[in-house]
């Protein structure tokens, strides 16, 4: 018995011995047990499916006894790589047991035959292996198996495990005794292989019989309980295995089950591929070019003969040497790859460039000392010999002797500019020069030539070449037509440029002539006799229209065809890019899916992130061609460059038919100029080889600045002329002559003799700077034709000299020319070899016609690269006029040295980021730390910028809530960008101090002062102020700038008031204006308040300063008049870290100076502990604030003064009444103003230098004389009082200069305001002032970055709902004028605004000063008036400048009728011309929308409540709805009474409704512009900082709408604490 039969026998014996025990075990099982595929289980889980369940018919104790066996089975199966599925069990006996035994015998009998056949095929190798199928073998490359093939690797691991288990099973089999197997039963090994072996599939015919027997022996219940195993990865199916493991003798079987191979793979012979098949497959896949010579006819188009350019005399260059075999291979490959034969030339050879390698090296090789140096390579040193350049001009001994003569004819001189030119002479010279250009262009008529050429080319394209000619193919015809089309495009471009030049030149001539005429009319005299006449030539309009339309249609069709071709090309590129993008996206998805699968298979492992790749952007399809757009472009271009059919042809004619105004009719300055011209004379010196040989006579300078000499100089010479020079000298009166310029004359050719020499003109210029005190414009000095000095010109002295130079002719008719020496001939012949241009003579380069003639006679090859520069120079010079581009290239070889293409550079994200930063785009201005690589730059960097470009015309209402204000903000942004772009170039200038930071070098005066100071007596009690050092913006960074706020003292702080006290005051309406504003102390003497016990603290105020969310506060003082004298320091951070001047000027941050009252509350609950402990809580109550914009501090450098505190009209728990004893001294100083005040000193450390305003000249429609008068008026005022503000002209919103009085005109206020107090003019004026103050304030320094100050008209101001002090003041002044008041616009300086605008009115015999931004008014002698000095007053018809000694409003007289006090602009010498106003005739107001205001009110209230809750993240915020409702009903009363006389009633109402609460709150009133200022104002009050546990809040918002969408916003914020 062989070993294979022994294995089968052992398995059969073990199976029979355990048969009885297995029957008993089946009775204890359920009717069916679920089968499951065998898989690896975790060692801690015991699979319940493997354990026998309790039988319904058996003893319940039996499964307990068999538990060790069951656990052994479970543990054994757990350790293996697979688990056997349990066989279905049944509870039936008798026939069921017999049928089960029969089925098992049949199965074992069938399995034994299969196992024997499988074992016969087993190869006795030490390790079972599996051969891959040929289909899988093809997937393997020479670099290894493909990464996606997981099946093969899994099979190898399974084979490795099977090998180890087979070895263990063999060793176990040798130890165990081999029981005898009854005949007819399989052995143990056969039984094991039957259940665990993977059999290879057999032919279908041999498999059908076992399957049939298997079906016959299986009942219906067993078929339902069986499950199919999923197909294995090796390709075959694993058979189901039945669990037959019960009984004591199953240990053998279990021991073998754990370590036996689960498959045996059949081994087949390896696949073999014959060499013949492999060669055949390579022939099909690869192309091997032939080495045979290709006939010439195959390399040329059909019916085309080869053309040899070298035989035709054209230069072709030397081709590089290539082996003939390689050429044949390449030719065969190209013919197969490209059948169109584009790689072959006309001669049938492959196109090749000339060999670029030089025949000899440019430098000798560097040899080491060990290497031998050949004699040919040794360096030969020769001493340098100085070359005598003048030897070619010296007559040598070998030359024939004789006298030679050169004739120089100087006919005259004309100045194209002279210092004595008047402005009219400048225009006349320009007009004459333009007219000469016109005549020259008209004579050439290049536009007509190009038009004819364009028509001929179009005819050639339409006709086409004759296709019947045998020597022309379709490719050649198409190539020729493409060349024609390209030439048509170029010719059309040149034609349009020429026509535009002609039209522009004609327009310029007419413009200069009009300027000349207007100048003559302005100056009322004439200096030049020039006269221009425009002659109209009528043409056939119908024919012109037809030709015009035909040309446009032809151009449209050509452009349409070009765009169609371009669109097809772009579409092809788009398809290619789209395919690439789709392929890339597919690869990315596959990678993503693979990473996801790897993460699911290995959830605990960290998967390395792949290297970031550049994302491909999905390409966009090109836009199709639009005929309408092309037609519009063609018609616009034609309208610019061509004459329209209905326009006549204008022919200018310039003549000297005019008359010059005599001296007696000219002003004194012009007479002085003419007399100065008469004093001047001119003469010329003639220099030969830098030696003076003669000079002309001195001729006086004519009135037309022409000088006629008419002299011929005969120079007897013996040497060749090296140089001929004329020096122009000018003499003024009896002074010494002055050299103006030198004129270098060309040396004539030997063929130029006297009598045939043409007269030529040579230009000259001078660099002298001459300034004159008369009407002469000077030389090298800027001057202007404008009255305001704009558009300045700087002209230098220049002119032309008419002359001719020729060789003289002797008596015998022989020219007296020095002959060329032999040495000179040799020298020129040597030059001819090196340079072709040098061999044609010295003057050959100056005469291009001679140069072209010489090139034609010498028959130069135009295709020779050595002659390319010369041929290009000749073609440009002989074409009449070349096309001069509008640019020049700094680096002509830039494209050759580019590292990447322009397209790739534009795709670079880093380059784009750098480019946007250099352009100062707002999103990237001052952007720092740009990454080095593109992959490190995220796409989201450009999201904001691209979104802004996309949403350029989209109105975003998210930040503004109100749609109208969103539109206004968008419009202001566009105006801001327009202004910034306009002044961007003008701002690019720097002072020396901006670029160089250095200490000033002390001079003798500074040193002297320092020495004197050392000797001065020191006075410590009176220190002197030292000037602070100023710094510039580029030296700053975060943390360098500090904001210093010095809190000095405060006056009349509201004091605490018991809740029970009430005051009876008359109502506001019952008090007259005279009572309110009388200056008597009795009106303001308060009654003594007896509610406070003696010695009780009235108020404990402290000041808190917040800036950029940084908060500092002072110590707590006591009393209503506290004194702190403390300095607070706050850091300043510029937006985006940009400390440039423009960035600092546009900062919108505000400094909030809040005054709080510190209140101590006793919170000790048990009075028994009051003697032993103190428990108090500090609360702070907001009393008022002062707001200071940072822009004001930045421009003023320091703010010093006393400011009124903005105290809410209702301050619960506090009273504004003062104590008689404490306030008696202070009341005597008070006049008209009420309120609380605080003294501050604010500055920036270090001191910053604000940018200087750019004084640019703007367009203006004002009269020129008026603008000149304004400049003169401002200059006179600034000369006497340089620090006072004088304003005569302003810039409107369109960028034009407007006289300032045009802005003042009576304009009607809203009728709704006039109806409130119909009989009280003063109350109406206050209401109108309050309406103006409700319009939001927006300084121009913030809007336009300090560039300029734009003035808008009143209707524009009301539409924009934003403006600075000037717009508010103009609107208020216009309202007052309409009310019949005497009102002026007052320009001066105020605190804290700086230069500002107020309104001055005359009321009941006294002057009142109105602040338009706050709506308050002050008396002239009010010490608390914020206006500190007065510069000028502006009325509707005049301007008055303050020329008084004092400038404070307290000390000046406002009577403008006194000329000694006020300097008026319009006077007797300059009467008022009756200027029209730029304001509209009347203002149209839209009715207020109360529904929109109510909706806006609810949204703002919701936003503020959310903000307060966000500001209290650690505390719960409770809202008292009852109190909120009470406050909401109270706010309309505040708006109606303007916040006056309602405090007591409101306090009583709150005490009545909320008596058990301690209430602290206040209303805030602001004009509405946007939400952010409202949020900042609420935040600055600190109402959210209360951390009492049982605190409740109330917030109410009320918006009252006024006409023109002006909104008044009231915000009532309160905190409530329940009394214990």
From Swiss-Prot:
Basic and acidic residues bias locations: 1-12, 103-115, 147-156
Stretches of the chain forming a coiled coil according to its record: 439-493, 532-582
Record's keyword terms, sorted: Cell projection, Ciliopathy, Cilium, Cilium biogenesis/degradation, Coiled coil, Cytoplasm, Cytoskeleton, Disease variant, Joubert syndrome, Meckel syndrome, Retinitis pigmentosa
Effect of residue 1528 to C: In JBTS9 and COACH2
Compositional bias annotation for Acidic residues: 220-230
Effect on the protein upon substituting residue 507 to E: In JBTS9; benign
Protein name: Coiled-coil and C2 domain-containing protein 2A
């Amino acid at each position: 018995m062989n070993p294979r039969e022994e294995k089968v026998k052992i398995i059969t014996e073990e199976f029979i011995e355990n048969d009885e025990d297995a029957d008993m075990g089946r009775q204890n099982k359920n009717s069916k047990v679920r089968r499951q595929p065998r898989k690896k289980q975790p060692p801690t889980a015991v699979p319940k499916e493997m354990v026998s369940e309790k039988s319904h018919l058996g003893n319940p104790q039996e499964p307990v006894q068999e538990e060790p066996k069951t656990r052994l089975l479970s543990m054994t199966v757990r350790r293996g790589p697979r688990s056997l599925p349990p066989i279905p069990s049944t509870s039936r006996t008798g026939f069921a047991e017999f049928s089960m035994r029969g089925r098992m015998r049949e199965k074992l009998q069938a399995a034994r035959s299969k196992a024997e056949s499988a074992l016969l095929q087993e190869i006795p190798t030490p390790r079972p292996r599996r051969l891959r199928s040929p289909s899988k073998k093809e997937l393997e490359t020479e670099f290894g198996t493909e990464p996606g093939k997981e099946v093969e690797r899994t099979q190898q691991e399974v084979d490795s495990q099977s090998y180890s288990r087979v070895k263990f099973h063999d060793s176990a089999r040798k130890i165990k005794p081999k029981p005898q197997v009854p005949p007819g039963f399989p052995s143990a090994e056969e039984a094991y292989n039957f259940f665990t072996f993977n059999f290879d599939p057999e032919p279908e015919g041999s498999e059908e019989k076992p399957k049939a027997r298997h079906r016959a022996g299986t009942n219906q219940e067993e078929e339902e309980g069986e499950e199919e195993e999923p197909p294995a990865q090796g390709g075959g199916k694993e058979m189901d295995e039945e669990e037959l493991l019960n009984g004591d003798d199953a240990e053998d079987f279990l021991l073998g089950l754990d370590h036996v191979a689960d498959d045996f793979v059949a081994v087949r012979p390896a696949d073999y591929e014959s060499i013949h098949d492999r060669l055949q497959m390579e022939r099909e896949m690869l192309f091997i070019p032939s080495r045979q010579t290709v006939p010439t006819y195959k390399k040329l188009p059909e019916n085309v003969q080869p053309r040899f350019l070298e035989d035709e005399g054209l230069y072709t260059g030397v081709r590089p040497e290539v082996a003939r075999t390689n050429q044949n291979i390449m030719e065969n490959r190209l013919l197969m790859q490209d059948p169109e034969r584009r790689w072959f030339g006309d001669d049938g050879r492959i196109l090749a460039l000339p060999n670029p390698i030089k025949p000899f090296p440019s430098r000798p090789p560097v040899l080491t000392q060990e290497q031998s140096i050949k004699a040919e390579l040794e360096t030969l040193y020769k001493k340098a010999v100085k070359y005598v350049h003048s030897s070619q001009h010296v007559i040598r001994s070998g030359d024939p002797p004789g006298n030679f003569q050169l004739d120089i004819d100087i006919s005259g001189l004309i100045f194209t500019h002279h210092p004595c030119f008047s402005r009219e002479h400048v225009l006349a010279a320009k007009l004459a020069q333009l007219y000469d250009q016109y005549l020259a262009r008209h004579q050439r008529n290049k536009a007509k030539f190009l038009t004819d050429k364009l028509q001929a080319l179009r005819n050639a394209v339409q006709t086409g070449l004759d296709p019947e000619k045998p020597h022309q193919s379709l490719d050649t015809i198409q190539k020729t037509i493409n060349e024609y089309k390209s030439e048509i495009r170029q010719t059309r471009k040149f034609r349009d440029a020429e026509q535009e030049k002609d039209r522009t030149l004609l327009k310029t001539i007419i413009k200069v002539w009009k300027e000349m005429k207007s100048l003559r009319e302005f100056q009322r005299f004439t200096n030049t006799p020039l006269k221009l006449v425009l002659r109209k030539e009528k043409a056939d309009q119908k024919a012109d229209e037809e030709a015009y339309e035909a040309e446009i249609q032809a151009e449209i069709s050509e452009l349409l065809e070009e765009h169609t071709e371009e669109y097809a090309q772009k579409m092809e590129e788009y398809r290619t890019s789209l395919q690439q993008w789709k392929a890339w996206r597919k690869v990315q998805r596959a990678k993503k899916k693979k990473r996801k699968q790897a993460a699911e298979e290995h959830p605990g492992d960290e998967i390395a992130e792949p290297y970031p790749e550049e994302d491909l952007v999905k390409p966009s399809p090109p836009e199709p061609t639009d005929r309408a757009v092309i037609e519009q472009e063609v018609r616009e271009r034609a309208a610019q460059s061509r004459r329209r059919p209905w326009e006549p042809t204008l022919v200018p004619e310039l003549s000297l038919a005019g008359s010059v105004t005599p001296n007696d009719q000219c002003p004194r300055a012009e007479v002085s100029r003419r007399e100065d011209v008469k004093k001047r004379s001119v003469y010329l010196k003639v220099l030969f080889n830098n030696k003076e040989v003669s000079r002309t006579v001195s001729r006086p300078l004519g009135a037309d600045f022409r000088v006629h000499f008419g002299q011929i100089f005969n120079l007897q010479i013996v040497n060749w002329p090296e140089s001929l020079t004329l020096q122009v000298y000018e003499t003024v009166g009896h002074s010494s002559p002055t050299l103006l310029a030198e004129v270098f004359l060309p040396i004539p050719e030997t063929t130029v003799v006297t009598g045939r020499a043409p007269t030529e003109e040579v230009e000259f210029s001078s660099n002298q700077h001459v300034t004159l005190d008369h009407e002469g414009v000077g030389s090298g000095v800027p001057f202007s034709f404008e009255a305001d000095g704009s558009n300045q010109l700087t002209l230098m002295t220049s002119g032309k000299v008419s002359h001719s130079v020729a060789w003289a002719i002797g008596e015998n008719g022989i020219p007296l020319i020095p002959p060329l020496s032999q040495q000179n001939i040799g020298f020129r012949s040597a030059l001819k070899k090196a340079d072709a241009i040098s061999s044609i003579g010295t003057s050959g380069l100056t005469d291009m016609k001679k140069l072209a003639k010489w090139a034609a006679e010498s028959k130069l090859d135009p295709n020779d690269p050595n002659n390319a520069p010369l041929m290009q120079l000749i073609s440009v010079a002989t074409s009449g006029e070349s096309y001069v581009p509008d640019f020049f290239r700094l680096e002509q070889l830039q494209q050759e040295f580019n590292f990447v293409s322009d397209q790739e550079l534009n795709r670079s994200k880093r380059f784009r980021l750098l480019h946007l930063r250099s352009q100062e785009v707002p999103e990237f201005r001052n952007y720092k730390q740009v990454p080095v690589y593109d992959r490190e730059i995220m796409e989201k960097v450009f999201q904001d910028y691209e979104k802004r470009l996309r949403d350029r015309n989209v109105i975003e209402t998210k930040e503004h809530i109100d749609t109208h204000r969103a539109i206004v903000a968008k419009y202001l942004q566009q105006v801001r960008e327009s202004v910034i772009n306009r002044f961007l170039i003008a701002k690019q200038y720097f002072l020396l101090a901006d670029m160089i930071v250095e200490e000033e070098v002390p001079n003798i005066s500074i040193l002297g002062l320092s020495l004197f100071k050392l000797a001065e007596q020191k006075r410590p009690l009176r220190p002197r102020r030292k000037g602070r050092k100023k710094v510039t913006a580029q030296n700053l960074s975060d943390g360098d700038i500090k904001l210093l706020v010095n809190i000095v003292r405060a006056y009349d702080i509201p004091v605490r008031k018991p809740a029970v006290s009430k005051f009876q005051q008359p109502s506001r309406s019952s008090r007259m204006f005279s009572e309110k504003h009388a200056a008597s102390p009795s009106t303001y003497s308060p009654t003594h308040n007896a509610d406070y016990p003696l010695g009780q603290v009235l108020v404990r105020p402290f000041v808190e300063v917040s800036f950029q969310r940084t908060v500092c506060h002072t110590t707590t003082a006591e009393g209503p008049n506290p004194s702190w004298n403390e300095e607070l320091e706050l850091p300043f951070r510029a937006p985006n870290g940009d400390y440039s001047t423009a960035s600092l000027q546009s900062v919108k941050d505000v400094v909030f100076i809040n005054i709080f009252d510190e209140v101590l509350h006793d919170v000790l609950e048990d009075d028994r502990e009051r003697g032993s402990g103190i428990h108090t809580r500090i609360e702070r109550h907001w009393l008022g604030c002062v707001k200071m914009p940072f822009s004001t501090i930045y421009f003023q450098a320091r703010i010093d003064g006393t400011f009124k505190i903005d105290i809410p009209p209702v301050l619960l728990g506090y009273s504004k009444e003062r104590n008689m004893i404490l306030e008696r001294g202070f009341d005597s100083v008070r006049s008209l103003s009420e309120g609380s005040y605080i003294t501050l000193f604010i500055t920036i450390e270090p001191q910053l230098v604000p940018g200087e305003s750019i004084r640019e000249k703007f367009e203006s429609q004002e009269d020129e004389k008026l603008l000149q008068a304004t400049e003169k008026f401002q200059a006179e005022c600034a000369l006497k009082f340089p620090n006072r503000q004088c304003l005569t002209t302003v810039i409107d919103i369109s960028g034009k200069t407007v006289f300032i009085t045009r802005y003042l005109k009576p304009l009607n206020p809203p009728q709704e305001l006039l109806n409130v107090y119909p009989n009280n003019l003063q109350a109406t004026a206050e209401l109108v002032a309050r309406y103006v103050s409700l319009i939001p304030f927006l300084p121009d320094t913030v809007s336009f970055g300090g560039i300029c100050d734009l003035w808008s008209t009143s209707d524009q101001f009301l539409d924009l709902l934003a403006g600075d002090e000037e717009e508010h003041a103009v609107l208020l002044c216009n309202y007052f004028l309409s009310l019949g008041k005497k009102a002026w616009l007052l320009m001066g300086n105020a605190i804290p605004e700086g230069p500002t605008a107020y309104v001055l009115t005359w009321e009941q015999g006294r002057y009142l000063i109105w602040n338009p931004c706050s709506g308050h008014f002050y008396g002239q002698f009010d010490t608390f008036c914020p206006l500190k000095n007065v510069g000028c007053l502006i009325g509707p018809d005049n301007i008055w400048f303050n020329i008084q000694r004092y400038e404070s409003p307290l000390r000046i007289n406002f009577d403008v009728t006194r000329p000694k006090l006020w300097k008026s602009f319009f006077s007797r010498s300059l009467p008022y011309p009756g200027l029209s106003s730029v304001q509209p005739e009347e203002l149209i107001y839209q009715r207020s929308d109360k529904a929109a205001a109510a909706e806006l009110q609810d949204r703002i209230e919701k936003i503020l409540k959310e903000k307060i809750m966000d500001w209290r993240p650690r505390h719960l915020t409770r809202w008292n709805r009852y109190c909120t409702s009470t406050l909401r009903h109270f706010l309309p009363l505040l708006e109606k009474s303007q916040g006056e006389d309602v405090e007591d009633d409101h306090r009583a109402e709150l005490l009545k409704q909320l008596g058990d609460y301690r209430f602290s709150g206040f209303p805030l009133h602001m004009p509405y512009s946007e939400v952010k200022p409202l949020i900042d104002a609420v935040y600055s009050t600190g109402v959210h900082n209360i951390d009492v546990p049982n605190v409740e809040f109330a917030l109410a918002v009320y918006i009252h709408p006024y006409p023109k969408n002006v909104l008044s916003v009231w915000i009532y914020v309160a905190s409530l604490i329940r009394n214990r």
